[in-house]
């Protein structure tokens, strides 16, 4: 992802965008 939210791709590793 990454298109829907700034941390969409990061959420795969870190969980929901904090």
UniProtKB/Swiss-Prot annotation:
Any GO BP: neuropeptide signaling pathway
Tissue expression profile of the protein: Found in the abdominal ganglia and perisympathetic organs. Not detected in the thoracic ganglia, subesophageal ganglion, corpora cardiaca, corpora allata, hypocerebral ganglion or frontal ganglion.
Annotated positions of the Valine amide modification: 18
Domain of life of the native organism: Eukaryota
Signal sequence region: none
Keywords, in A-Z order: Amidation, Neuropeptide, Secreted
Compartments, as annotated in UniProt: Secreted
Annotated GO CC locations: extracellular region
Family listed: Belongs to the pyrokinin family.
Stated role: Myoactive.
Protein name: Pyrokinin
Classification of source organism: Eukaryota, Metazoa, Ecdysozoa, Arthropoda, Hexapoda
